[in-house]
A protein has these predicted regions:
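Conserved beta-sheet core of the metallophosphoesterase superfamily
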Residues: 6, 13-23, 40-142
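Catalytic phosphate/metal-binding cores of nucleic-acid and nucleotide-processing enzymes, i.e., regions
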Residues: 33
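A short, well-structured beta->alpha microelement
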Residues: 25-27
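Structural motif
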Residues: 36-37
């Protein structure tokens, strides 16, 4: 899974390498963070750290981005069904939305054996305003 993902990212990177307004991070970091205006966006495959640990990991791994942003999101991808949890005010963290996204992949033998069947296949995208956080969601069901 990691090798296939890296090879896909590297292929896309090679195709768009001369485009000045497209950037890529194809490092092997398990969690990646990006800022866009007042947004801090984290991403991970979702098979590593627990969902509840993501806000503090974000704050510790990207402290300068954390300090400069107002809206914070972590998008996880490993789960093949829809789950959403909102982390608001708390003792150790506040204001981070952590969300598992649907998968466009079908059920293979492992998913079938473990009962992960029947989930809707989908790709999800988000539009973030530089000033107002996430302002739209797009979902394409297969």
């Amino acid at each position: 899974d990691y090798i296939s993902g890296y090879m896909l990212a590297d292929s896309i990177y090679c195709w768009f390498r001369r485009c000045e307004n497209i950037t890529f991070d194809i490092s092997n970091n398990h969690r990646k963070y990006y800022s866009y205006g007042v947004n801090l966006i984290g991403s991970s495959h979702g098979d590593g750290a627990k969902m509840a640990d993501m806000p503090l990991l974000m704050a510790n791994e990207a402290p300068s981005l954390w300090a400069k942003t107002k809206y914070r999101y972590v998008y996880l991808h490993h789960i093949h069904h829809k789950q959403t949890t909102k982390f608001q005010s708390g003792k150790d963290y506040q204001g981070v939305t952590v969300e598992y996204l649907r998968s466009p992949s079908g059920s293979d033998a492992w998913h079938h054996r473990n009962g992960y069947v029947g989930a809707k296949k989908a790709i999800e995208a988000f539009i973030h305003s530089k000033d107002y956080g996430q302002i739209a969601r797009l979902t394409h069901l297969f």
